[in-house]
Amino acid sequence: GGVIDVVPSAVPADNRVFGDVTLLGKSVNGTIGGSLMLGIRKNAWYSHIRYSEQHFGDYRIPTDSIVYLTQRIPIYGRKLKNTAGIERNIGLFTQYQRRAYKANYAVSNVYQKTGFFPGAHGIPDASRVEDDGDSRNIELPFSKVNHLKVTTHQQYAWEKLILSGDLGFQNNHREEWSAFHTHYGSQPAPEKDPDKELAFNLNTFSASVKARFIGSSSWEHILGWDGQHQRNDISGYSFLLPEYRRSTTGMLWLTTYRPNNVFSVSGGVRYDYGYMNISSHEDTYLADYLRKQGYDPEQIDFYKWNSHSVNKHYGDYSLSLGLVWTPSDKHLVKVNIGRSFRLPGANELAANGVHHGTFRHEQGDANLK
């Protein structure tokens, strides 16, 4: 295990215009891509914009066949048909800093379209994986993802106090497309977008405030609050996750004591509260199918619900205490103890369907506490 800390690029010390170009290539799927960045530093202002794009073909694998649902599926040319894709990303960052005040603004958009291997999507059919002569086309089934993110960070520093705040908005739109298919003859194809199997539109609003108190050279405290609200809407002829509303908030206190360069103690406590409102989802076509098969009303009522309505409140605390001892340049000792709490996600409470992106069936448990 480990932790990766992604640190943003340092702001140039002097006024300048700068940029870079990066090219990318991979043999496993014929990836061709590149990234272009252009930036400027002018007195108190610093800005840069980056655009990246890559195209890739069907993935190569070291086998001539796979087994899916007990059926052997051939892999022609050792390439997974229809696993090609495209990615386009663009991001803009602007920062203003003057004396004790600093603010930055960021906007980014990430787009991806990738195909699904048809031999492992839906009912096994070897004819769907026959080589079509084009290793870079994207046909049904496929997925599309677009993620928009807008954030701002504001900060003001006094001699022994630093106040900061963040606001953010994210829109995550995901679609999975596959030729309309159903297990029940009574289910008609939708009039609009008949091949749209799944679609999720998740909007997230977030805010946070932190106050950092520097009492002395050896002691500092951080007091903070954050909150988030999410709304997820769905569409498509299949089902994986219901519509839901999720609101969370939390307060924290952290403290660090460093009497010298050899020893330090840090600790903190946090309390989180959350509310989850999940809509029920009824499969009327399954209910009709079971009714025609002669199931009794009690069995039909049990099986027809993809998800049940959930209205739950959650709240609990987390705490931690850590010691760091550095007796020499070659030795470091760390001791940590803590208790953690995490609010469950909507998928953990109410998912019920095949998630092709992770190649598994997911089923939530509404009784999680």
Predicted regions and their residues:
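Solvent-exposed loop segments that connect transmembrane elements
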Residues: 63-78, 119-136, 179-195, 277-310, ...
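Structural signature of Gram-negative outer-membrane beta-barrels, strongest in the C-terminal barrel
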Residues: 218-222, 226-230, 236-369
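Transmembrane beta-barrel wall of Gram-negative outer-membrane proteins
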Residues: 29-55, 68-117, 146-158, 214-219, ...
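Transmembrane beta-strands of outer-membrane beta-barrel pores
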Residues: 23-29, 42-44, 53-57, 98-100, ...
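Flexible loop and strand-edge segments within Gram-negative outer membrane beta-barrel domains
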Residues: 81-87, 101-159, 163, 169-203, ...
